[in-house]
Amino acid sequence: MNYYTTKEIQERVDSYISQFKEGYFSPLSLMARMTEEVGELAREVNHYYGEKPKKASEQEKTIEEELGDMLFVLTCFANSLEIDLSQAFEQSMTKIETRDKDRWTRK
């Protein structure tokens, strides 16, 4: 199994997308794709943990697969807007760690 840094993920996706004339989709199209992938993830979570089992005719997918699809689309979105996901993550974690430091009961 390979493990990638966020930089490596962004570079691999960019290398893949750069092969094609069309390049990255527009931000609005990527947002629609992200929404589609979130819906597919929700469906899988509902099948595994909710009250709605899969039909016998439904294709077997996993939560892991859907999370991977979301990561791909998220990376496309970030790349198309020239956003470094490591920096975006650092900004978010700093905000969350400051804002929520006393919100939860510590172990």
Protein language model annotation of sequence segments:
Residues 1-67, 71-107:
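Flexible "arm" and connector segments at domain edges
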